[in-house]
Amino acid sequence: MRASYKGIYKPTYPKKYAGDPNRIVYRSLLERRMMVYLDKNDAVEFWASEEIPIIYRSPIDYRIHRYYPDFIFKLKTGKKYMVEIKPYRQCFPPKKPKKQGRSYMAEQLEYIKNQAKWQAAKVYCEGNDLEFKIFTEKDIGVYS
């Protein structure tokens, strides 16, 4: 399993950030790479990270939870997006190993939970003139 990277992002153009530009947290190198892209891209009018809560019901514990999508941004063309950043392997059901252990069960539960989150995000986007996308390392680029 890959090491997790976490830190505070300091934007080059803080006025483009919709929120507190001193409290932008990234939880992976993919998220950080997306932040740099949104911050420095002239086509982006504004962007935010984990600023809007989406309410969803977990199919695991049947309770209501809050989900904060990784990014929301608006292009100067007027198009608005909500984006979740995930490793490619987490976008599909885990492959069933010959011997099922705890890691397989944890991956399965995480996949089920993510599907519920993403469905709630899609519903939210439909009612708020946003397009929901899931970006992986294949969309953003490999770790560096």
Could you tell me what each predicted segment is?
Residues 1-144:
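Electrostatic, structured charged patches in enzyme active sites and in nucleic-acid/phosphate-binding
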